[in-house]
């Protein structure tokens, strides 16, 4: 074990899953034999879906309530009172003081650690079933007292011991190494023997052990199971003081030599505890407990300490309760009463601010009134009555037409031009509408007058004659195209197509346009030729279409021709009567010269 500690001490710094599993199973077995009080929040241990550490926390919490519920037991053994937790019942053995000191120190360490975990103590020892204890291997399993009685050590209740590791042997070897270090002066009894600012690499170079890991004498219980609580340390010190007081008041030793030896052992154990506390403070001390002066620190350490202090201040400010002004929108319930009276607020409002009525503004207004009265300056606005009431004229009302105008822009310009050119005779739409209304009024009035006359007379009153305007024109009825000079002949009035009519013989190479003018193909340009070809193709297409339609309607045409010969009349959709006529009997008018366009 010592070789393993010196070679690879870091193996004990990491938890072993198998050992932790055995520890939890053994603890559950012990928990099943203990009666848990009703005040405990945990009555059953839940293991499904939880790891060993969570199960261990449940067991520790349940054991705490179970230990508090047990009665106190007085132990007369002074070594049990001194060490606070032990498995010995009689310590009057006549073994050697050195062996007794080693065993007591070893038990002190084990029991103090178990008490810190919450699974040991005088109360818990009574509840643990003897069947749940395991045999401890090694020569340290049994110790003989003065009367030769064999006392069994505390059982391994947590399953830490296996074929390779034994917690008792480990504690003994650790204490032995610590004693050797104390004797050699490595660990002194005074605090001055430890230099807090020393370089730890210096001792590592001088050490015979060439391993890079931590030394065996520096490995503590806290390296495996975490630091002890302050309550556990205070309870341990209290029990130590009580044991010392009882030891001084109870002269139960056989001789002074034995008493001196035991006192020396107690002092050595106290010194060892003090040494352990100093080493623990050196390892786990915080920045607040560092008493090193600022002169002995380097510039980097001073900057680091200053930065740490700033971080602590900022963290404290962040965690502390903030004022209501720093908590966002605060209502009346979220701030103290009358807290707005001492605060200047800036807020936006949509209304016009009311002027503040101060003493200065009041005095200024009073002085202004007094000065006006003294100078008799009464420049108020004089009252005046309206001269005349404006006359309402409906004709001046403007009627806006919301509908879109139906007239074109040319008609608008035409109307505007007529209005400017003939201002006297021009009549707008409003004037025309007004005249129409006047005519309607006159017609209604004449009808009313005639009705009144017929009622007042004894005879029939005929309707008044209506005045009709007829325009008689004395001018000769001559059309413009018929007016010709008397000396001119009819030949001069003919159109070109009437003068020249190409016959079928001399029509080759000539084309008659729509206007009737003949043009030669040599005189035609490319566009005119394309237009002629399109016209010819269109003419042939229409002819073919007519022939196809004629063939389709040959039966219908025959029936219609038969009906037309018989002078049959047919009533149409509008109720009119018409004779049936075939397409062959339709009238084709003859085009004369008067119907041709120039």
Curated annotation (Swiss-Prot):
Renumbered to this chain, region (Disordered) spans 76-151, 183-274, 284-303, 499-598
Cross-referenced Pfam families? Mpp10
Q: Where is the composition biased (Basic residues)?
A: 235-248, 529-543
Q: Where is this protein chiefly located?
A: nucleus
Bias (Acidic residues) occurs at: 76-94, 124-145, 183-211
The answer to whether UniProt assigns keyword Chaperone to this entry is no
Keyword Ribonucleoprotein attached: yes
Its biological purpose is as follows:
Component of the U3 small nucleolar ribonucleoprotein. Required for the early cleavages at sites A0, A1 and A2 during 18S ribosomal pre-RNA processing.
Under what name is this protein listed? U3 small nucleolar ribonucleoprotein protein mpp10
Q: Which organism is it from?
A: Schizosaccharomyces pombe (strain 972 / ATCC 24843) (Fission yeast)
